[in-house]
A protein has these predicted regions:
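Conserved, mostly hydrophobic/aromatic
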Residues: 215, 229
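Extracellular carbohydrate-recognition regions
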Residues: 38-66
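Metal-dependent polysaccharide deacetylase catalytic core of the NodB/CE4 family, i.e.
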Residues: 208-210, 230-319, 324-327, 333-336, ...
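Extracellular ligand-binding interfaces
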Residues: 89-99, 103-167
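C-terminal domain-boundary segment and adjacent tail
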Residues: 42-46, 188-206, 231-232, 241, ...
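Extracellular beta-strand ligand-recognition surfaces/modules
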Residues: 111-113, 156-192
């Protein structure tokens, strides 16, 4: 990756904004927008410990009998090289690479990785194993949703303990002496490459957080979900609305949006219906400007800084262009999000629909409480009489979910509230 591309990506994750301001750019880039005061976030969380910056080609060893590794100076997220891992294409023969450590305390931390996948569809899973000389280890899902690596460019992936896949034996997390990265090929796949550019630990948050969000601005947000949440003692949520859908049958009106914000404390945020990956840069900008103009004109400057990707789809152009319009982009990729998020432009979620069960909610909330991650529950419609669509959640079921959230005792915050309170994790040099 050329130096200017690396710097662009680094500035991206640090919130750097390089384009000239316009009436629809982020409030901090213009003097005409007046966002309400935000609480001052704490100092950025520094890495607890850098485990490997990939600059020593001898530090990592191939521990599996399959696949191969080599230092690669043609692409890197940091320094002058990365570690290239080539898979076998056989799901029964994963490729594992090991890093020996002198003994690192990982009892209370999160993990910070920079990864690049040649083709994410060729990979079933990427697992991080933390252990010692034997086979005892904590096994984590680095990317529970492999779409996180869809762009083929360098991605920052932060991992919370809530992404635990298995505990083998009795690993000593107070003295980890071996880190293993295991890449499992997808079934019927071809050999493919994965690059590892950086690995570190990060401090854990003081508390887990739950957010409730709704996509598309359906009037069930106002008529059904809001009342259920209030009855459960949950104050507010985030509604991601589409400008040209507001006021249509089945969608919230401008008056209802105003009441949701001014009376009930909800945040009204940005969404769209067009697949942005089908557009050129001018088209992407038009979509962003349309929804930001609508939200700013109707008095929602804080929500206007947060965008939910239509159908969860994005590419490098969408990510790059979004920097000048938003503070966060929300995906539909299912994974526990770290606090603070490592990449605010790829926020991961707990995507909920008619298929979601109470046991899944219970498990997600228990892990959120124990491991202090961000559990961001995303819904579409909450219906008294569901129509069978996967995005339609029965009101009785939603009520049980909200009672589970309330009973957990976890703080519930809107997306702008979470993002205001969390300083971005600095991108390592």
């Amino acid at each position: 990756m050329p130096q200017h591309d690396r710097m662009r990506r680094r500035n991206f994750l640090m919130g750097g904004l390089a384009l000239a301001a316009s009436s629809t750019l982020l409030p901090e880039l213009q003097s005409t927008a007046h966002a309400s005061p935000a609480p001052v976030a704490g100092p950025p969380a520094a890495p607890s410990q850098v485990l490997s910056d990939m600059q020593d080609p001898r530090a990592w060893t191939l521990s599996s009998g399959d696949g191969s590794i080599r230092p690669d100076t043609s692409t890197h997220s940091h320094g002058t090289q990365s570690l290239e891992v080539t898979t076998t294409g056989d799901s029964r023969r994963p490729t594992s690479v090991d890093l020996a450590l002198s003994g690192v305390d990982m009892t209370d931390c999160q993990w910070d990785l920079w990864l690049r996948a040649e083709d994410y569809r060729q990979i079933e899973s990427i697992q991080l194993e933390l252990g010692g000389e034997g086979e005892d280890c904590l096994r984590l899902d680095v990317a529970p949703d492999m779409r996180t690596l869809r762009t083929g460019s360098w991605c920052r992936v932060t991992v919370n303990r809530a992404a635990e896949r298995a505990v083998v034996g009795h690993p000593r997390l107070d003295r980890v002496t071996r880190v293993r990265l295991k890449t499992v090929p997808a079934s019927d796949s071809a050999p493919s490459r994965l690059w590892l550019g950086y690995l570190a630990t990060l401090p854990s948050a003081d508390s887990g957080i739950v957010s409730i969000s709704f996509d598309d601005g359906y009037d069930s947000d106002y008529k059904t979900a809001r009342e259920i949440m209030q009855d459960c003692g949950i104050r507010a949520a985030t509604s991601y609305v589409i400008a040209d859908k507001v006021g249509l049958p089945g969608r919230m009106s401008t008056d209802q949006l105003a009441e949701m914000r001014e009376v009930h404390g909800w945040d009204i945020a940005a969404h769209a219906s067009t697949d942005l990956t089908t557009l050129d840069e001018a088209g992407v900008r038009q979509e962003f400007e349309t929804i930001r103009s609508f939200l700013l004109e109707h008095g929602y400057p804080e929500g206007a800084a947060h965008f939910a990707l239509p159908m969860g789809r994005y590419n490098d152009l969408v990510l790059r262009t979004s920097q000048s319009y938003f503070s966060s982009l929300r995906t539909i990729e299912n994974a526990p999000e770290t606090l603070a998020p490592g990449d605010p432009f790829r926020l991961r979620v707990f995507y909920c629909g008619s298929y979601t069960t109470e046991s899944q909610v219970e498990r997600a909330l228990a892990r959120c409480q124990e491991y202090r991650c961000w559990t961001h529950m995303v819904f579409h419609r909450v219906d008294e009489e569901p129509d069978g669509a996967p995005e339609s959640v029965k009101a009785d079921t939603f009520e049980r979910f909200m009672k589970q959230v309330a009973d957990s005792g976890l703080p519930v915050k809107t997306v702008p509230e979470v993002m205001r309170s969390q300083s971005p994790v600095p991108a390592p040099e």
